[in-house]
C-alpha cells in the first residue's frame, strides 16, 4: 500500500472540540476488533509516516491517528482535545507512543485515565518527578538542542533544513542495516520531505520543549495500568540514554520490558513486523 492509497482507504475526518477548534484525525473502526489503538508518532509529528503501521494494526484492531496540530499550543490542551475526541467516538484505547509520542501518551493517561486501557511506549523517556540526576540532565540536553535548532530555522532555507534532517537520519540510523531496511528508511525520509512544512516544524519544536512543564509524574499516576504497560526500549537506541530508560521503567507499574528489538531509535520503522507482532500479542493477551 502506498501513502496515496492509504489516504484514499482511510480518509481524514474532523471533530470540533469544546473550544471551537477543529481536530483532524484518521479512524478505522474494525467491526471484529475488541481493542482500539491510538498511534502517537514521534517528534516529526506526522502521523502519516505511520501509515504502514496503521494498515498493519487495522487487521486486528480499530485504529486512530492524528498529527500534533498547530491549533493546540501545548501538551495539556492537546491531551484534553484527544480525550474529547475519544469520548465522542465512544472509545477507550491503548495509547501506542513512539519517542515524543510516548511522552504525549503519559500526559493523556495522567489527565484522562478514564479513556485509557493501557500503554505501549517505545524508545521514549519519562515525565517522572523522581527522575535521576543523569536522566534529567540528558533530557534537558535534548530540549536545549531543539531550542538551538529552532534558531537555525529562523535564517536557514527550509529545503536545506529538510535535507540536513534526511542526512542525519540516514547517516546515524542505518549503519549495519540490510538493503531492505535502508529502503524502508529512504521511504520514511521521502515522505517526511514531502509532508513537513516550516511552520509545523517550528510548532513541533515548541511542542516537544513544552513537555518539561509536565515533569512531576509519579507511579501512582499510572497505577490503573499495572501489568498493562509494554515498554519497547531498544538497546541500540542512542537518542535516549540508559538513565532515561531506567527512569521510565521505574515510573511504570509492573511493566513488560523488551530491549532486543534492534534498529536504533526508529526500530519500529525498520522492524515493523516484529514490532507489530510484539504489540499485538501483548494487547490481545490482555483483552477479554
Predicted regions and their residues:
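Conserved alpha/beta-hydrolase "acid-adjacent" motif
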Residues: 238-244
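Short beta-strand/loop motif that positions the catalytic acidic residue
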Residues: 225, 231-233
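Catalytic histidine-centered segment of alpha/beta-hydrolase-like enzymes
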Residues: 239, 263-276
